[in-house]
Amino acid sequence: MSEIAEVVPKIIEAIFSSVQEPFKTFNITIKPLENSRSFWSECYQILVTPNSEAHADKVVSPIFVKIPRISAINAACDPDNADENMEILRTLTAQEVTFYSDFSGIQFSGFPIPRSYYGENLGNEKMAGLACEDYSGKVYSIDFVPGFDESQVLQLLEALAHFHAKIIEISDEIPWKNYENVLYDAAYIRMLHNDTLDFEKLCPAELSGRIQEVKHAFDEDGVRNSEKKNEKLGMPLVICHNDLNASNVLWNNETGKIQAFIDFQHVSKGPVSFDIIRILCLGLSVENRRANTQRYLNHYYTTFKSHFSTAPFTFSQLEESYRTHFNFVNATSLFSLSYYYKMYKDESLDLKSGADEREHKAQEILRRTIGILDDM
């Protein structure tokens, strides 16, 4: 990222619209986040200090700004599909802006999300972007490898349980029409399958034919079929993050607790097991996942049912939901794993790790991929 996008200063002016000439009233630094692991969007940190005490109470800082411009990682991993990816990014941007707008007045106890300062989708393309609370210096994120430790997995499942319970509680207030999963249409699922097939070429000894064998999991009508299966199980629909991997959870430096869930670009309605499957399959070793799935599901359910005099579904229904939706959720997860494998193999995309560490991470991603394929 060599230059600051034109829209960023305009977003700053919109955030500080109650102040005349904010770039004169405040000292404002715009920092491109060149090493951001954001796959889709271009990201910035905004630092603001007042020029005088008279405006100190107007300061909001630091601020995280994300704009719908294809990131360097996306461009490097998928150089041949820039136009197609930009159209996807339009959809993702609109969905995240909608989420922050719809839920801005609701407190999700136990499921923290950043405070939103600004949101505009591509209906107003010149001003499109999102600005949120920035936690720099207070938080850390973890890598796909090693992934979540025991304490983190339990915290994540508790947080999801609290979130799902709240969503069910306020279900009548939610504009569900805004959360149709329009992204996962037939064309998008075909694209996921075709791109994931490249994983076979990258690792022919381990994966030759393996992605092709599970083509059935890349169900082009998977969203509707998942909802039908969910209804047959007698389960409620909830709001799903749909991209709940390690990079989208921020952890407090001092307490080790969850500080915030971020990046709601893929958010939609869906079964309660969708995000649970992603956490366990993307964030854990194969051995850990297989040995502890039932225990982790039970931990989620214990927290979830504590919100109700009579829970809206049983533990057996939750287990069946996990099994029922495992294949479709992991079809989209395989796509993510293939891109992280490419990233770890490319020194220019993982600047923090040495060659040996990058190779170790790539091999662990491959092991998780094989484990998922074996279980589909």
Curated annotation (Swiss-Prot):
Keywords for this protein: Kinase, Transferase
One Pfam match: DUF1679
Record flagged with keyword Transferase: yes
Transmembrane segments: none
Record keyword Cell membrane present: no
A GO MF label: kinase activity
InterPro entries named among the record's database cross-references: CHK_kinase-like, Dhs-27, Kinase-like_dom_sf, Oxido-Kinase-like_Enzymes
Similarity remark: Belongs to the choline/ethanolamine kinase family.
Protein name per Swiss-Prot or TrEMBL: Uncharacterized kinase-like protein D1044.1
Source organism (scientific name): Caenorhabditis elegans
Taxonomy of the source species: Eukaryota, Metazoa, Ecdysozoa, Nematoda, Chromadorea
